[in-house]
A protein has these predicted regions:
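Active-site beta-loop-alpha junctions of metal-dependent nucleic acid enzymes
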Residues: 95, 114-137
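An active-site-proximal beta-strand-loop segment
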Residues: 76-111, 117
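Conserved, non-catalytic sequence blocks in retroelement Pol enzymes and Pol-derived host proteins
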Residues: 11, 30, 75-77, 92, ...
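Short small-residue beta-strand/loop micro-motif enriched in glycine and branched aliphatics
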Residues: 109-113, 169-171, 195
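Mobile genetic element proteins and their domesticated derivatives, centered on retroelements
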Residues: 1-2, 17, 21, 37, ...
Length: 257
């Protein structure tokens, strides 16, 4: 069963594998603790080894206006309260690519994305427009949070935010914790779904599209109480972790919206 699950999510962590297998264990009348499953996976060589990588894509030395961080002490309590945006590097044998992502800070659902062979603002705008088109709660007040990269400070990008009534927040320094959700989602896509080292740009786009779909609709999120981002996006009254320096306590009372 683990091998079948790994065909869809090759590097899914052990805790999430255990959670995903609970219905199967129940159907078979089996009981398997997390530590026991870890032992089985370790003996079979199925535990995932994480590797760290970092390629800087933020270019914050530019002439555009830089906005303040207005979510620093905010409590993220609902979907479409805060979106986080970031750009991550993707390697192919043809050329270097850059993946622009817009993620909901509450549900961790990837709302919009765009893959490009350059760092121009147009690519980030396409990801943003996709996210806006995918809004489930268009009447809710929304804050867009990002680093101080020139793409997000560009007047053309700001114009799209203003047109849609979206407030702007930016990091104050180059600190991963100030945009922790975006950094974490980048890591999940690379570490668990292996979205790098492709042969061609066409292959990269095809496999990244599949990976994002699997991430949104199938992958359980620890910080979402093992809900998928798609399901978490529809929850209310559930205080989720936001990958800050101090995680908030979770209120286990749920209501589906």
């Amino acid at each position: 069963m683990i091998k079948v699950l790994r065909k869809r999510m090759a590097k899914l962590g052990g805790k999430k594998v255990h959670k995903k297998l609970q219905p199967h264990f129940k159907d078979q009348g089996l009981r398997c603790s997390r530590s026991k499953l870890f032992d089985i996976m370790r003996d079979a060589g199925l535990l995932v080894k994480k590797c760290k990588r970092y390629v800087k894509t933020t270019q914050s030395y530019h002439r555009f206006y830089k906005y303040a961080n207005i979510i620093k002490d905010a409590k993220i309590e609902r979907s479409e309260q805060v979106w986080v945006s970031d750009i991550t590097y993707i390697k192919t044998k043809e050329k270097s690519l850059y993946l622009s992502l817009v993620t909901d800070a509450y549900s961790k659902q990837i709302m919009g994305w765009e893959l490009s062979d350059n760092l121009k603002t147009e690519s980030s705008i396409k990801a943003l427009k996709m996210a806006i088109g995918n809004r489930r709660y268009p009447n809710r007040s929304l804050i867009h949070h990002s680093d101080r990269g020139f793409q997000y400070c560009n007047p053309e990008y700001v114009k799209v935010l203003d047109k849609n009534g979206i407030d702007i927040s930016m990091t104050t320094r180059h600190d991963p914790y100030e945009n922790a959700v975006a950094e974490r989602v980048n890591g999940i896509l690379k570490d668990e779904f292996g979205i790098e080292n492709f042969i061609t740009q066409k292959q990269a786009k095809r496999e990244i599209k599949t990976a994002i779909g699997t991430y949104n609709y199938e992958r359980p999120h620890l910080s979402c109480g093992y809900l998928t981002p798609w399901d978490a996006h529809r929850m209310e009254g559930y205080k989720l972790k936001t990958w800050s320096r101090k995680f908030t306590e979770r209120d286990m009372s749920l209501s589906v919206n």
